[in-house]
Every structure is written in C-alpha cells, then in structure tokens.
C-alpha cells in the first residue's frame, strides 16, 4: 500500500519510508492511499482473538513492505500481554486496553511501532534517534515499547512539574 501527504496527494511513498520519515517534508501527515474495509476482510471477526485480527489489519497496510512471517513476528512481539474482551450486555462487548506493561492503551501503538521500526533498522549501520515530547502516558508507553531495541535511541522530554504523580510512575 502507498501513502500520501495530507498536503499533497501527488507523491506516493511506501510504508517503510513513511514510518521512518515520520512526517512529509510539506508538514502534512501520511495517510494510506486507500482504507480497506476490514469488516469484509475479516469474516467471523467476533470469533477471532486480537492477534488474528491485528494480523489481518496490519497485513492490509504492510504486505508490500514486509513478509507475512515478519508481520506475524511484529504482532506477536507487540501484543505479548492479555487484552481480554469482556461481555457488558447481550451483544455488547468491550476490549480492555489497559493490561499492557504501562497500563495505557498506548502500549498497543507504541509496541507495534517499535517492533515495526526494529524490522526496518535491522542490518542498518546507522542508529535511529527518536525525540518524543509528552506530558502523559505516551512517554512511558514509548519508553517501554522501545526498551532494548537495537539501533534505536529514544529521548523523551517531559515538561517540568506538569506531569501527574501516577504518570510519573
């Protein structure tokens, strides 16, 4: 799948490029050139676990850049904690997103990003440096997600005296 800048749809890039670049040079945001209809892609979605669903969705965006085995590795590494679906009412279920290592829903995204970027920097002779500025749980999720990822250094900036006690922990 190709991605374009929200400020210019004319230049298409692949997923790896968009991921590693972060932002287009025209200060837009990268968007997929098409949005797959995952309801049609995943028959019986209500009977699948989160890793199976994640694989199908990730594959629809990553298959041009990664082998299926690499996508499976990314998903298995990124979602290595419980994420139970809890029945609330008849026909109403909720996916609990707070069971990750930092208890934040951002664990899913940060770990997926770190494992995907790790695949991109393998066999690269340069380190990737990532600068993150946050006042909340993004920092802990990113720090945990990128911990011990070879070839990637993460610097997290927090505003002085603007972070809650629970988020510091």
Language model: regions and residue ranges:
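PLP-dependent amino-acid enzyme catalytic core
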Residues: 1-169
């Amino acid at each position: 799948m190709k991605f374009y800048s929200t400020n210019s749809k004319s230049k298409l890039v692949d997923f790896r490029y968009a991921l590693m670049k972060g932002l287009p040079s025209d200060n837009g945001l990268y968007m997929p050139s098409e949005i797959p209809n995952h309801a049609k892609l995943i028959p019986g979605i209500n009977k699948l676990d989160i890793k199976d669903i994640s694989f199908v969705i990730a594959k629809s965006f990553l298959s041009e850049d990664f082998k299926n085995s690499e996508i499976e590795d990314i998903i298995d590494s990124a979602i290595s904690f419980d994420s139970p679906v809890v029945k609330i009412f008849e026909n109403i279920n909720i996916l609990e997103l707070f069971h990750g290592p930092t208890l934040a829903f951002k664990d899913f995204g940060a770990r997926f990003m770190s494992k995907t970027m790790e695949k991109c920097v393998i066999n690269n002779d340069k380190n990737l440096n990532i600068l993150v500025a946050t006042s909340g749980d993004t920092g802990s999720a990113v720090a945990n997600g990128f911990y011990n990822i070879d070839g990637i250094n993460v610097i997290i900036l927090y505003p002085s005296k603007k972070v809650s006690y629970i988020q510091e922990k």
